[in-house]
């Protein structure tokens, strides 16, 4: 898939200097690696690590953007995170990599952008975004709305 995406990260003071209102703050991020023959394991580690770093539980996350290059990969992470069934309507609410595409160089930027705009739309406080571990490496972030 072809795509391009960008988002701007800056300090709160820089945003204020420029008269900009932040869409969200990066509360915590984590990366993890594991056996590249079993990519979801890296995602599992990163998702759990970012929750610990943020001091949050899975029940406090209002929206999830979990990159879904393969359905089994996403399902593995959903189950390993023990996301409650009544929270499934918070996962990939606008589609996923299977339906939206998976442009490798732009995927995470696309997911972050989708997440923070959906958080604003729904007045959500916390959102989690991540790649489940293609090649054995995963990166996950938790964003918080002001």
Predicted features, each with a name:
Residues 1-146:
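Claisen-condensing/thiolase-fold acyl-transfer catalytic domains that form or cleave C-C bonds
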């Amino acid at each position: 898939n072809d795509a391009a995406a960008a988002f701007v990260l800056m300090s709160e003071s820089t945003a204020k200097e420029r008269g900009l209102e932040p869409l969200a703050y990066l509360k915590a991020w984590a990366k993890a690696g594991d056996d590249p023959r079993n990519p979801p394991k890296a995602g599992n580690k990163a998702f759990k690590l970012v929750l610990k770093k943020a001091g949050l539980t899975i029940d406090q996350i209002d929206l999830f953007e979990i990159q879904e290059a393969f359905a089994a990969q996403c399902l593995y992470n959903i189950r390993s995170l023990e996301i409650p069934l009544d929270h499934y309507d918070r996962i990939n609410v606008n589609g996923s990599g299977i339906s939206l595409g998976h442009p490798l160089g732009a995927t995470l930027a696309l997911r972050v952008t989708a997440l923070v705009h959906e958080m604003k739309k729904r007045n959500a406080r916390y959102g989690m975004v991540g790649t489940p571990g293609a090649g054995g490496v995963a990166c996950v972030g938790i964003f918080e709305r002001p």
